[in-house]
Amino acid sequence: MVINDFTNTNFVILAHLYNEKNNENVIKTTQDEVADKLQLSRVTINKAFSLFVQNGYLQRDLKHVGRYYLTDLGCTVVENIRTLSVEVNMLSQKSLIK
């Protein structure tokens, strides 16, 4: 994993996909729907999806056009970044209290 893969925008997109996945990690939301929901351009979403597929965070569903699976790696990345964010916020609050 390359940290540059996770600019704020890319992480927002991947986290949104994480929230949209079903219990089999299937994402039925289209790129257009993601763009509308996140108020981002279709080009931005398409570039992010391509990056995520290239790096193993998403996998295309070969049976259904436009459908993707969030891989175990993609899930782990979102969970780890969320955990790290909580820990950093807690440390920041502790340093403000001192």
Predicted ranges, named:
Residues I27-K37:
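A short alpha-helical element within helix-turn-helix/winged-helix DNA-binding domains
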